[in-house]
Curated annotation (Swiss-Prot):
Keyword annotations: Fatty acid biosynthesis, Fatty acid metabolism, Lipid biosynthesis, Lipid metabolism, Mitochondrion, Transferase
Descriptive protein name: Mitochondrial holo-[acyl-carrier-protein] synthase
Single Gene Ontology BP annotation: fatty acid biosynthetic process
UniProt keyword Transferase present: yes
Family annotation (Gene3D superfamilies): 4'-phosphopantetheinyl transferase domain
GO molecular function, one term: holo-[acyl-carrier-protein] synthase activity
EC number: 2.7.8.7
Keyword Mitochondrion among UniProt keywords: yes
Compartments (UniProt record): Mitochondrion
Function: Transfers the 4'-phosphopantetheine moiety from coenzyme A to a Ser of mitochondrial acyl-carrier-protein.
Organism of derivation: Eremothecium gossypii (strain ATCC 10895 / CBS 109.51 / FGSC 9923 / NRRL Y-1056)
The reaction(s) this protein catalyses: apo-[ACP] + CoA = holo-[ACP] + adenosine 3',5'-bisphosphate + H(+)
Length: 174
């Protein structure tokens, strides 16, 4: 599916984006609040818990977050949604992918998801990076109220990206 990309750069249209996958996750905030009550920030239990699904950048950011529960829930939901957007037989285990990506804010405060290729390489999943993630990006939306936080991820590629099966078809037809 090709989606027109209406953002303009100067007077040039940036082209189209192709949706490769979508994912969403919903977190019940009282559950996260209770979890963090039992594992307060700075404790060994919290460090072990965060190390299971947070990138080093997120672990550092968690210590300074004004609202720990919202921060942790936002990171968790974003990664669950990302995993659903890239799900497939060749995907690495969820925990590996969770530790290899990180949620951060862009220059104007919008949430973004980045993938650390070095983390995937150290975990032995460079092929997944090369075939499924390189040349793509993740669009992230996070919303919350008192009791719930939801994250939506759209995995997109520009018109130059070729998935492995497309590269094989092009090679066979050449």
């Amino acid at each position: 599916m090709l989606v027109p990309h209406d953002r303009m750069v100067g007077n040039k249209r940036r082209g189209t984006m192709r949706v490769l996958g979508i994912g969403t996750d919903l977190v019940y905030m009282p559950r996260v609040v209770e979890l963090l009550r039992r594992m307060p920030a700075g404790s060994g239990a919290h460090a072990r818990f965060a190390g299971k699904f947070m990138h080093a950048r997120e672990r550092a950011g968690a210590l300074g977050a004004k609202d720990q529960a919202r921060y942790v829930a936002g990171v968790w939901a974003a990664k669950e949604a990302l995993y659903k957007a890239v799900a497939g037989a060749d995907a690495p285990p969820a925990a590996t992918l969770y530790r290899a990506c990180y949620k951060e804010a862009d220059a104007v405060g919008r949430p973004t998801l980045q993938v650390d290729a070095g983390e995937l390489q150290r975990a032995g999943h460079m092929r997944f990076w090369e075939e499924r993630l390189a040349g793509t990006r993740f669009l992230l939306s996070v919303s919350h109220d008192e009791d719930y936080l939801v994250a939506f991820v759209c995995h997109v590629a520009d018109e130059t990206f070729r998935a492995p099966d497309e590269r094989q078809r092009i090679t066979k037809n050449s």
